[in-house]
From Swiss-Prot:
Residues 12-23, 31-48 have a biased composition (Acidic residues). Residues 1-130, 480-499 are annotated as: Disordered. Residues 113-122 have a biased composition (Polar residues). GO terms for biological process: defense response to Gram-negative bacterium. This is WD repeat-containing protein 55 homolog. It comes from the Eukaryota.
Length: 499
């Protein structure tokens, strides 16, 4: 163990009190300098001059050039004075001890922590800062970059369904305890407006009317509640609307809405009346989704027993029922100018029907190898699918193409919705969280032609701009671009790079 001749160990507390802080720091600095000097003399095999390394010319300027890289050891001199020191103009003849004391004094004045090997650390930190300067700047720029979507909403209770308001920046979150939380969303922050206690059991579906005046909810308690958005009061209660738990609800216009329960019963309601307009039971299992087109002539229902059933609203009877499928029909959407109906299944398949011909599908796409439980149309030809794997995927309809991953959750996705402008998607998962995804980039997405070459494997794993994950190809593309830029600015690269 190396000891310094001037080092003294205090024998009692009085001697400790007599030691000045500057003296302690100065002594530590002297030890540091002597250890560094001995280290240099004992390790001659690492001498840069003997190794043939280039020695920087000393022009008398003690200031540090920020363009030097830490990858070269020739910039390191443990005995050199710190360039940031106010005493950098002192004569070098003062020796290592004086230099150490000066350095120690400077550390105390600058309120920096003292410690051995401080000078070398200062030089090293400076070099690291220089080398990672671009990275740090990029990180700061990413932090300061304006958000393109609202931040995540986290609840204590399980979120069963979500729905955007048609006119205002409000989203409704239904929970398993029967409450509905209304949030005002913004790219900077989300604000809880109110919590409405509507049901005694799980609220399974929540929808706004087309004009946004009323909020409709259905529940496991077999009731349908209509809440006025302005007064926040209950407008109408359909108590025991079904004999079984109600699973889904669909709003047709400002007055009409339809409901489906766990036993396969479908009912059509009018807000201006007390009772249902009609009731039909053509299925034996849970109604998974209800939908209509803009004309509101046909009401379509998918069910867990593998049927697509269509009802004629005006005639108040069943129009047609599809052939049975050996899988649950879980979701659906209308595309291509109301000419195509696409149905998602529990086996990850997508079935396409020509409008009006719902007896059997005209096309089938394998889709993804995971159950599809949710589907929302983003544009007339692009759908977003979600399910148990926690990924939201975009798919081009007719012809089918996997466009990539829109967003991710750590757990299965429970609900999915798109706002009225079609620019923002919200999704909730079994982790009791709601995440937002900006999908405005789909507006500029070109149409896909039939027989166009594509790589299905890469498409299924491709991350779109809204995704929180990046693509490996993007990283290597950036490297290639940087190399090309370097070659363009390097005259010594060859005649091919010269203008």
């Amino acid at each position: 163990m190396h000891t310094h001749n001037n080092f003294k160990t205090p024998s009692d507390e009085d001697e400790l009190d007599d030691l000045d802080e500057d003296m302690v720091v100065g002594v530590i600095a002297e030890i540091e300098q002597e250890v560094l000097n001995e280290s240099d003399s004992d390790n001659d095999e690492y001498d840069l001059v003997d190794m043939g390394a280039p020695v920087p010319e000393n022009d008398g300027d003690s200031s540090y050039d920020g363009n030097e890289s830490i990858s070269s050891d020739d910039s390191f001199d443990p005995n050199a004075a710190d360039s940031d020191s106010d005493d950098s103009m002192l004569d070098d003849a003062g020796g290592a001890s004086a230099g150490g004391a000066t350095s120690a004094k400077r550390r105390k004045d600058d309120d920096n922590p003292s410690g051995s090997n401080r000078q070398s650390e200062a030089t090293f930190d400076l070099d690291v800062d220089d080398e990672t300067d671009e990275t740090v700047r990029a990180m700061i720029a990413a932090i300061k970059k304006p958000r393109s979507a609202p931040p995540e909403i986290k609840l204590e209770d399980f979120i069963t369904d979500i729905c955007f308001h048609p006119d205002r920046d409000i989203i409704a979150l239904a929970t398993i305890i029967g409450d509905v939380h209304l949030y005002e969303y913004d790219n900077e922050a989300n604000k809880l407006l109110r919590t409405i206690e509507v049901h005694s059991k799980a609220c399974r579906d929540v929808e706004f009317t087309e004009d946004g005046r009323f909020l409709l909810t259905c529940s496991k308690d077999k009731c349908v509640m209509v809440t006025d958005m302005e007064t926040e009061k209950l407008k109408k209660l359909y108590e025991t609307a079904h004999d079984d738990a109600i699973n889904t609800l669909h709003v047709l216009n400002e007055n009409l809405f339809a409901t489906g329960d766990d036993a396969g019963t479908v009912k059509l309601w009018d807000l201006r009346t007390k009772n249902a307009i009609f009731e039909l039971k053509e299925l034996e299992d849970q109604i998974t989704q209800l939908t209509t087109n803009d004309q509101n002539k046909l009401l379509l229902a998918t069910s867990a027993d593998g049927y697509l059933t269509t009802f004629n609203i005006a005639a108040r009877k069943m129009y047609v029922q599809s052939e049975p499928y050996e899988e649950e029909l879980s979701c659906m959407g209308i595309y291509r100018g109301d000419s195509k109906l696409v149905v998602g299944t529990s086996k990850g398949r997508l079935y396409t029907y020509n409008w009006g011909q719902f007896g059997y599908h005209c096309d089938m796409y394998p889709g993804i190898k995971s159950p599809i439980s949710l589907m929302i149309p983003i544009t007339d030809r692009i759908a977003c699918l979600a399910g148990e794997d926690g990924n939201i995927r975009a798919c081009h309809i007719a012809p089918y193409r996997n466009l990539g991953v829109v967003g991710q959750h750590n757990m299965p996705i429970e609900s999915l919705d798109v706002n009225s402008s079609g620019e923002l998607i919200a999704s909730s998962s079994h982790n009791n969280d709601v995440r937002f995804w900006n999908v405005k980039y789909f507006e500029d997405f070109g149409d896909i032609k039939y027989n166009e070459k594509h790589n299905a494997y890469k498409e299924q794993r491709h991350n779109l701009p809204s995704s929180k994950c990046s693509n490996a190809s993007d990283f290597f593309a950036d490297l290639t671009k940087e190399d090309a830029d370097d070659d363009d600015h390097d005259p010594s690269a060859g005649p091919s790079n010269m203008a």
